[in-house]
Amino acid sequence: MRKTKIVCTIGPASESEEMLEKLMKAGMNVARLNFSHGSHEEHKARIDTIRKVADRLGKTIGILLDTKGPEIRTHDMKDGLIMLEKGKEVIVSMSQVEGTPEKFSVTYEDLINDVQVGSYILLDDGLVELQVKDIDKTKGEVKCDILNTGELKNKKGVNLPGVKVNLPGITDKDADDILFGIKEDVDYIAASFVRRPSDVLDIREILERENNHNITIFPKIENQEGIDNIEEILEVSDGLMVARGDMGVEIPPESVPIVQKDLIRKCNKLGKPVITATQMLDSMQRNPRATRAEASDVANAIYDGTDAVMLSGETAAGLYPEEAVKTMRNIAVSAEAAQDYKKLLSDRTKLVETSLVNAIGVSVAHTALNLNVKAIVAATESGSTAVTISKYRPHSDIIAVTPSEHTARQLALVWGAYPVIKKGRKTTDDLLNNAVATAVETGRVTNGDLIIITAGVPTGEKGTTNMMKLHLVGDEIAKGQGVGRGSVVGKTVVANSASDLEGVDLSESVIVTNSVDETLVPYIEQAVGLITEENGITSPSAIIGLEKSIPTIIGVENATKELKDGILVTVDAAQGKIFEGYANVL
């Protein structure tokens, strides 16, 4: 099972039912809606279509609302475009004017108070660079030298690298969009241009005022101020998005990979999901194949420890949205297969802080690795159990069984977690039985698989992960007292006397008999296992089992009547249990 999650931006190229179905089948886990573009009516139509297709396919798909944020843009230019020439001067006005090569204006009136002589102003993702030469606060004008030639069109982005700006945490539009998201029951908010913890708390205040406790907040770190305040920002956040687009304009491009690794590591330490975004497969907007550099970029983000990787224009407006998702999926699967999970677990154990809940998580991960369990089944109300285990990046699949649709969609973004919605768990026994049955229903585990079940007891309390149980999936058909510690798989041969075994090939057989006498010994020596009804560790059955090092179970009531000839069984002498079929016992 692929463990790294894929976020796809939904736009004109991907909003149809047909294409959404293709993206979901290709590997999309979360649908991102960019509120920098489009009306509420357009986004509602997309949300409805996403949920309709997901329900039809039986998929759990999260929905992420990406705010426009408090960005700075230019106003309109004369004839829609002006040319700025290197070596000349241009005035940036705080009052709205029609842009000319001599003067244009910006949407942020306090820019004049934030910059100083020598500050840089970058236009249109850094394609045009200005340097502040003089500031005239009386006129509300900033005179700049033009450092390189370039075109400037209407409403282009403005970046102020290294400058602390006094923009609000969220705009009126953002607040309106968030209220819309609450009404439409979105799962996550990606908050654009977050600079300080108060920016996140402004959003949290809206959610709390609306009594919403389901939506999680992922600040987008896109500037130096956000990088500098990352520790405090993470304290009030549920996760993080490493938004490399504007970040690569605000800080030197060569610093972006270093910052990316640092931000991901900080999230990993706290066990908070992190998304790596922007230009991951950018060339696939135009071409059906990714470049080698892009493949390396996606893989290295996974090696860095990201929970999810994101596609932007590739799926929103590109020519090959389905191919982009498939490519990202294949890169993720390949990168995960090359991971050294033993080393990964060791590194995570050292990185993540010790706590009672984390102690269970790390124990689950170590046990899963040492015993090579097929899956970890996390029974969870809030999702915290699955998140706790995910911190340690276990090789085994994490099947998160939850009664909550909201929790399932939240887990769509968590590394390694496969959420399954299942109602009805009132007692601990119900919880365990329900978890096992649900895991089998997914097809990811089958009879004979060794799994770990983990949960919080009592049920329903967030952050109380405190239970771990090893469980063998399958039907236990009989039990008694085991002799020795081995296990074996074979077909039963029921024998009431030695004559029943004459001429029978016993090389892969388990003999089932009432008791053992000397006439049976030559046949028992040929068999792989022994099951008898007689009791006692000093009985002939126990003695012959020990002497011949044959996995033996004694004291199995009515064995010769209950166990039929020719059925495949697993004899587990360590537990004194007999399972139908093959069971992966220790």
From Swiss-Prot:
It is an enzyme of class 2 (transferase). ATP binds at N34, F35, S36, H37, R73, K156. InterPro entries: PEP-util_enz_mobile_dom (IPR008279), Phosphohistidine_dom_sf (IPR036637), Pyr_Knase (IPR001697), Pyrv/PenolPyrv_kinase-like_dom (IPR015813), Pyrv_kinase-like_dom_sf (IPR040442), Pyrv_Knase-like_insert_dom_sf (IPR011037), Pyrv_Knase_brl (IPR015793), Pyrv_Knase_C (IPR015795). Substrate binds at R32, G245, D246, T278. Its EC number is 2.7.1.40. One of its GO terms (molecular function) is kinase activity. Disulfide bonds: none annotated. Gene3D superfamilies: Phosphoenolpyruvate-binding domains (3.20.20.60), Phosphohistidine domain (3.50.30.10), PK beta-barrel domain-like (2.40.33.10), Pyruvate kinase, C-terminal domain (3.40.1380.20). It catalyses: pyruvate + ATP = phosphoenolpyruvate + ADP + H(+). Mg(2+) binds at E222, D246. Pathway: Carbohydrate degradation; glycolysis; pyruvate from D-glyceraldehyde 3-phosphate: step 5/5. The keyword DNA repair does not apply. The record marks K220 as: Transition state stabilizer. K(+) binds at N34, S36, D66, T67. Pfam families: PEP-utilizers, PK, PK_C. This is Pyruvate kinase.
